Amino acid sequence: MSEELQPNQTPVQEDPKFGFNNYAEKLNGRAAMVGFLLILVIEYFTNQGVLAWLGLR
């Protein structure tokens, strides 16, 4: 009678759907790599840098 009841399962916690989670960080990193590659390709073919695109040079 003095025994404490213990759960027989460990609750499964889901990853948060917002904020800094593993999926969001991977997606952000991949998008950054693709964007950086596109900037390099555009600079190579146009012979102009980012500052020239923005009108700062």
Curated annotation (Swiss-Prot):
The keyword Transmembrane applies. Disruption phenotype: No visible growth effect of the single mutant; double hliC-hliD deletions are out-competed by wild-type in high light (500 umol photons/m(2)/s). Quadruple hliA-hliB-hliC-hliD deletions die rapidly in high light but grow normally in normal light (40 umol photons/m(2)/s). Quadruple mutants are sensitive to norflurazon. In an hliD-PSI-less mutant phycobilin, protochlorophyllide and protoheme levels are reduced. A single gene deletion red-shifts the chlorophyll/carotenoid ratio. Involved in photosystem II (PSII) assembly and/or repair under high light stress. Required for binding of chlorophyll and carotenoids by the Ycf39-Hlip complex. The Ycf39-Hlip complex binds D1 at an early stage of PSII assembly along with Ycf48, ribosomes and ChlG, the last enzyme in chlorophyll biosynthesis; it may be involved in chlorophyll reuse and delivery to D1 in the initial stages of PSII assembly. Binds chlorophyll a and beta-carotenoid in a 3:1 stoichiometry in the presence and absence of Yfc39; in the Ycf39-HliC-HliD complex, HliD binds all the pigment. The Hlips might regulate tetrapyrrole biosynthesis, maybe at the level of aminolevulinic acid synthesis and probably stabilize PSII assembly intermediates. The gene is hliD. The keyword Transferase does not apply. Keywords: Membrane, Photosynthesis, Photosystem II, Pigment, Stress response, Thylakoid, Transmembrane, Transmembrane helix. Belongs to the Hlip family. One of its GO terms (biological process) is energy quenching. Probably forms dimers which bind 6 chlorophyll a and 2 beta-carotenoid molecules. Cofractionates in an approximately 50 kDa fraction of the thylakoid membrane with HliC. Does not associate with mature PSII. Purified in several chlorophyll- and carotenoid-containing complexes, including photosystem II (PSII) assembly intermediate complex RCII* (iD1, D1, D2, PsbE, PsbF, PsbI, Ycf39, Ycf48, HliC and HliD) and the Ycf39-Hlip complex (Ycf39, HliC, HliD and pigments). This is High light-inducible protein HliD. Induction: Transcription moderately up-regulated in low light (5 umol photons/m(2)/s) or heterotrophic growth, strongly induced in the absence of photosystem I (PSI), probably a monocistronic operon. Expressed at very low levels during growth under normal light (40 umol photons/m(2)/s), induced under high light (500 umol photons/m(2)/s for 6 hours) with maximal expression by 6-9 hours and decreasing after, and after growth at 4 degrees Celsius for 6 hours (at protein level). Upon return to normal light protein expression is stable for 3 hours, then decreases. It is found in: Cellular thylakoid membrane. A motif (Chlorophyll-binding motif) lies at residues 25-30. Its main location: membrane. It comes from Synechocystis sp. (strain ATCC 27184 / PCC 6803 / Kazusa). One of its GO terms (molecular function) is chlorophyll binding. It is a single-pass membrane protein. It comes from the Bacteria. The chain crosses the membrane at residues 25-46. One of its GO terms (cellular component) is photosystem II.
